[in-house]
Amino acid sequence: MSDIPVSKRAARIEYAIRDVVVPATALEADGHEIIKLNIGDPIAYPGLPTPEHMIHAFQESLSRGETGYSPSYGLTELRSAISEDERAKGWSCTPDDVYVCHGVTEALQIIFTATLEEGTKVLAPGPHYPPYMAYPQLFGAQTIEYRLNADDGWRVDFDDVEAKMDENVRLLVLINPNNPTGNVAGPEEIDRLISIAEKWPNCMIIADEIYDELDFTGTQKSVASRSLTVPVFTLNGVSKVYYAPGWRIGYMALHDPTNRLGAVRDGIERLLRSRLCASTPAQMGYL
């Protein structure tokens, strides 16, 4: 009998840094030595442990029996703490603007689900984190890469961004600091990207700032703190700065300076409720 067919959506999905593990694991089982450069897991390297106070808080949460469901948008105390952190970065974030997710990757899935339709586009830096390419395909959307100039420290090529923007671009992505190049966009570059996005009324910015505290240049700034016009989804979490990628705890924070995200916010909240919640003990560890 022939195989039961897989959905076209699933068949299209590729995730290069994980997909390569399948043949590599087979080779390793055959006795070959494999040098693993595919995924940046800080826990895989000596000297980068998850902070002890976070582990203790996680364990204490388990000891107290806090293993039930949390609110779908995240623990109230954690949302409040995150909003304080974001306000310290220069914008008026409230606890209601913060949504706790199963890592930044789930936050991306929810944002894409709430904003993309057939024929829409995501404009993301090339190179970038694979989900920016993979997940939009589920919705019949397309990811277009804008150029990072290797001869100029991997800075954003703004002429290329301008040339690739159109009315179908719903999401303009800035990963800052950038993964994998390490480039840090400063305030002037952020302002220029915002000025491009604001020419297109239906365009929103994704500010992936998961590496923000690993900036050693002193130039990294919150995109939300710079935008007076364009809606911004700020993404962050525990995976990189706190060396806890396996906890799968991250968040999105919505900056809506001109009050245009009402319908999108409603869609995001519906999606969050439909998937129940993020891990309660892991949230307590983050808190």
Locate predicted features.
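Residue-level marker for buried hydrophobic side chains located in beta-strands
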Residues: N176, I205-I206
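Conserved core of the PLP fold type I
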Residues: S63-E198, D212-R226, F233
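N-terminal small-domain helix-loop-helix segment of the aminotransferase-like
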Residues: D3-V6, A10-G103, I110, C277
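Conserved core segment of the aminotransferase class I/II
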Residues: I55, L228-L287
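Walker B catalytic acidic pair
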Residues: E209
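Helix C-cap/helix->beta junction micro-motif
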Residues: L27-D30, F139, K199-P201
